[in-house]
């Protein structure tokens, strides 16, 4: 997909916030396969709470940007989120996932990577922040796929004061994959379901059609098996900390229904649909793909202000 800037004016609103620069400190987490690198964003405040920001799927870096195989998408969503929270007296830690950008040295061979590796990394950061006397409390925020990672890292973890699901899926990954391919011919849909059924049962599939090799290549199947074990509805129900579920109503990647499924699974959770916010946390008044794509490639467009206000109220309640 080539991202166009046509129509970007539809996504710029005066309600967005201009923030001053925050102080940043580089930090790293040692793992058996190498260092994972991140940045702490510090507000001008004494002993602030800190929020661990966990990015979504794919080659997404700590700032919320993608740069892989000749495809670049810079929107600075997580960096802008960190800056906005710093203005409100809240510290953040965002990091490059193992194998991505500055954490590329911590990569595992694809066939050795498991979903639990990302969970363990998040738990490592939580431990690190919990031991840092500069911060009053540790909160976890997971965006998109990072929501499930953050949930799992927070279950039975007394070091986590509260959890925030931001545009997190409410269904298992295999359901989402099958939905995304629902427009394909019936034969393809049948093959995908058959492969997924095997992977859900913990069985790798050897005969993958060439057209599905990118999605189900043999080296990624162990990771998919590990990912498919988790249903976000079941995981979020195990959380004992305060939980905030946030979803934008102009998100074309994750639906409001996903957020509602999470809320149904944990009725006591706080829940808010944010008006005119899309998947990269920007103000956008349209679900038209050309307009949406403009925000995905605009690093100067601020994040939605109500998002910052809602997170601040939750963290400082």
Segment roles from a protein language model:
Residues 16-46, 50:
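N-terminal cap/lid segment of alpha/beta-hydrolase-fold proteins
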Residues 277-281, 286-317:
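Catalytic active-site module of serine/aspartate enzymes centered on a nucleophile-bearing elbow/loop
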Residues 77, 110-132:
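Alpha/beta-hydrolase active-site loop
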Residues 127-181:
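Primarily recognizes the serine-hydrolase "nucleophile elbow" in alpha/beta-hydrolase
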Residues 45-85:
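Short, surface-exposed "cap/lid" segments of acyl-processing enzymes
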Residues 164-234:
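Accessory cap/linker subdomain of secreted extracellular hydrolases
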Residues 239, 245-247:
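Short beta-strand/loop motif that positions the catalytic acidic residue
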Residues 1-14:
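Single conserved hydrophobic/aromatic residue that forms the stacking wall/gate
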């Amino acid at each position: 997909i080539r991202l166009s800037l046509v129509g970007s004016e539809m996504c710029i609103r005066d309600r967005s916030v201009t923030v001053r620069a925050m102080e940043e400190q580089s930090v790293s987490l040692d793992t058996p396969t190498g260092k994972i690198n991140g940045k702490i964003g510090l507000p001008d405040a004494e002993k602030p709470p800190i929020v661990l920001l966990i990015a979504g799927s794919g080659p997404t870096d700590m700032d919320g940007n993608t740069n892989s195989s000749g495809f670049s998408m810079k929107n600075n969503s997580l960096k802008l989120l960190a800056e906005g929270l710093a203005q409100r007296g809240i510290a953040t830690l965002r990091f490059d996932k193992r194998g991505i950008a500055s954490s590329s040295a911590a990569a595992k061979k694809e066939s050795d990577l498991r979903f639990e590796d990302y969970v363990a990394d998040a738990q490592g950061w939580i431990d690190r922040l919990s031991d840092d006397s500069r911060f009053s409390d540790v909160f976890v925020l997971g965006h998109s796929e990072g929501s499930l990672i953050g949930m799992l890292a927070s279950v039975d973890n007394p070091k986590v004061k509260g959890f925030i699901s931001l545009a997190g899926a409410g269904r298992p990954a295999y359901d989402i994959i099958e939905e995304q391919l629902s427009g394909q011919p019936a034969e393809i849909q049948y093959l995908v379901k058959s492969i997924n059924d095997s992977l859900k049962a913990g069985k790798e599939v050897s005969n993958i059609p060439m057209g599905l090799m990118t999605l189900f290549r043999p080296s990624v199947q162990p990771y998919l098996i590990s990912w498919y074990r988790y249903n976000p509805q079941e995981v979020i129900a195990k959380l004992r900390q305060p939980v905030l579920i946030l979803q934008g109503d102009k998100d074309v990647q994750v639906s409001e229904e996903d957020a509602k499924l999470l809320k149904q699974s944990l009725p006591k959770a706080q829940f808010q649909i944010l008006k005119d916010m899309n998947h990269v946390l920007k103000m956008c008044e349209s679900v038209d793909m050309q307009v949406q794509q403009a925000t995905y490639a605009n690093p100067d467009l601020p994040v939605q202000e109500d998002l910052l206000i809602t997170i601040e109220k939750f963290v400082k309640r």
